[in-house]
């Protein structure tokens, strides 16, 4: 099940243009007015795969209008902005469930990746690669799951399937959760996990799991996300630190962020997020334009003892013009807390993912897996094996980004992909 505007699509700069008419789900053949190609496409898709059923759906205007009114009530935003959120939501979940009827083979994927070939890259994210089909160096995360959680994935899919087209067409019978447990345990030690979702006004459990786990964080939080522009989350983090400080909690707290420098869309929201975390100087033109706000003193008080790094990723390479640098595009949607908890999936740190679009994440309390995520990712980004001491890690990140800044000035190869987030653009739009 997918959104109507995304069926078989790939963007205009991508390999496949069958769905370039995103607003209406048109194919490239239709856009070019090629009736012969249209007929061929229809015949090919009809006969290429037997027993293939595709359903598309969009979020209706009534539900969209309710979403818009909800935003106006809670955030006091302008009618046009509220209408945009309500009228143009998307189905953003990325999930695969295979061989469900065969418990010994059943497998689920809860993903950040889109199902397009040009979202592929290696962990090295080279400056140039003949294997990478399109785009730029690309960093993304997904999970493979087994066991009783497959029933939750199936229920979630069935819900979307029936909403798309309640035709009464049969779907595989829901099996008892227990039948998936034994095959999964043969693969190794299991961990407790659950799915969480965003379904418009119906469910916002991804937002809830972010709020709940941040409230319990005591040592560090790591965000690795395509977007970092959901100000309510920053304000929630500040409220938690303020409450802990008032209760006499003595320890420092560390926030590590890896995200992208925004394009024109979303720059205003990103600035507001960074401003709420006392990092607005990373966007100097916006910082100068907005000056010191009424919240500045509160930011310092709330975040006393909170140490924050906001970073991006890049790679370097020699070209005919000399040394050049390219961003590694971060498409991940991951949060780690205290080497105890992680959530990963399709949800970005923005309003759309937390409150509007349909999203699917997995949430897991597992010291083993959370530490494994952190060690592998931080080694990729910093070029060194991280320790478990967050004060030492914070200093190590600081040293790496300063070293890379000097290397970029001197036109040298980067020592590691991690660089400081910096956006010197003077213009930008609000996008949620």
Please annotate each region the language model reported:
Residues 199, 225, 241-245, 318:
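Structural motif corresponding to the C-terminal cap of alpha-helices
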Residues 1-216, 258-333, 352-354:
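HKD-type phospholipase D/PLD-like phosphodiesterase module
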Residues 119, 162-173, 219, 223, ...:
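Intrinsically disordered or highly flexible coil/loop and linker segments, enriched in small
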Residues 96-98, 213-230, 332-337, 341-346:
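Conserved catalytic-core segments centered on acid/base and nucleophilic motifs
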Residues 101, 207-222, 240-250:
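Glycine-rich phosphate/diphosphate-binding loops that line cofactor/substrate pockets in enzymes
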Residues 1-10, 228-255, 271-274, 353-355:
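Classical protein tyrosine phosphatase
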Residues 108, 113, 207, 231, ...:
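Long, C-terminal catalytic modules of enzymes
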